[in-house]
Structures are given as C-alpha cells and as structure tokens.
Amino acid sequence: MIITTHKQFPNYKRYEIEYEGRPLVMETGKLAELCNSAVLVSYGETTVLVTCTASARPKDGVDYFPLSVDFNEKLYAVGRIPGSFMRREGKPSLPAVLASRLIDRPMRPLFPSDLRNDVIIACEVLSVDRDCSPEITAMIGASAAVSISDVPFNGPIAGIVLGWDGEKYLFNPTQEQRKTNRMTTTIAATHKKIVMIESEADQVPDDVMYEGIVQAHAHLQPVLDLIDKMVSEIGKP
C-alpha cells in the first residue's frame, strides 16, 4: 500500500494497491472540494471521478430514501468526439443506466433505513481501459466516496467480476480473457458478506459458481482494507 501527499494541495491523499494484477489508485483532496466527498479512482487506465453530495436537511413528504446514482459516460473517455451538428452528448445509454443500478443495488441497503436526506452519487467516466471495467471502478469509488463522507453508511463495499473459462477462475478478466469466458458474474461484498450478485453463464455447475463466489469474496478484501484505511485517516465524523 502506497500513501502520498502533495505540497500544493494540503488535503491531497493518494492511496494505491495492486488489484488483480493492475494498479488501483484512489486520490482525494484535489477535485470537487465543495462536495461532501470526492474520489478520483483509477484502475489500470480506467479513471472515474466519483462525488457524493447530501442535502443538509431531510426531504419533506417522502417515506423512502432519496438516493440517486448517476453513471455518466462521455465519448471523450474512449477518444471520440460526438459527430452530430450540436456536438452534444445524448441521453444516458442503456449500459450507463444499468451501471447506475449496479452501483445502487448493493449500496442502498447499507444506508440507515430512516435516512431521508437527498444523496447524489455521481460517477463521471474520464477514461476507459477495455481491460478494466469502468463499472467496477465506479462502484469502488462510490463506496470510498460515501465511506469518507459525513453521510451515515454501513459499508464499505467493493466489486469484482468473476469469470470461468471451463478450467480456471478469472478475476476481473481482460478483454482477451472474456473471449473464452463461460461465466460473467459481478459480485459486491462487505468484509463479512456478499450483498449483490449479477450473473450470466453458459451451463456452469452450481459447485463451480459457489466456489467462485467464495474465492471472489476473498479477492475483494484488499480493496475493503484500503477503503478502511482511507476512512481512518481522512473520514469525516
């Protein structure tokens, strides 16, 4: 684990670990300082800015938790410029909407059931490495951003993609490995338990799936430990 600071930004912190063969870096204190918290997370060459903002007072007249998770894709993240006359981005794509739900699902139950303040988690994709999932990167960043904020949260969580090629398990498989993949399972978990599983598979035996989930949970622990380290050093009360 590597932790560094910056002279020009007194609140700047940089945390780095190796996650499934690729560097996972989380930086705070440099961007979006007016939010409750902000984390710039990079996994390989994939970079996502995640911000967490909460209202100061509970929202009137609601009997639910008003949480919004926005996963914003930009064409410049893959080196393209919109070709339309207006040069504007369109509405969120279906994969972006599904990515927002992927992050929302494991996090929502970990907030207090009586919380009525507006909470917005915005994930802005800045660059994409096709070997490193921006959805998983955003999920880790969202967990870190909420954990170090002053919003009550019973986390952290971390995410991983579990694959299987018929012989061995693949954790956060690369684009080349996904070509022979017989199973793609996205798993989110806390230190103690699995909180979300989303899977598509081609006739994978139950025992293979179960053992893969157990191993994936173990592979998540370094990321959770890193977020705990961030909370202990820069977390808001």
What residue ranges belong to the model's regions?
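Glycine-rich, flexible beta-strand/loop modules in the N-terminal catalytic cores of phosphate-handling
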Residues: 23, 35-120, 125-127, 132, ...
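Mobile "lid/hinge" segments at catalytic clefts and subdomain interfaces of large enzymes
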Residues: 152-237
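Feature captures eukaryotic membrane-trafficking machinery centered on endolysosomal pathways
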Residues: 136-145
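Short, Gly/Pro- and small/polar-rich lid/capping loops
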Residues: 1-33, 38-39
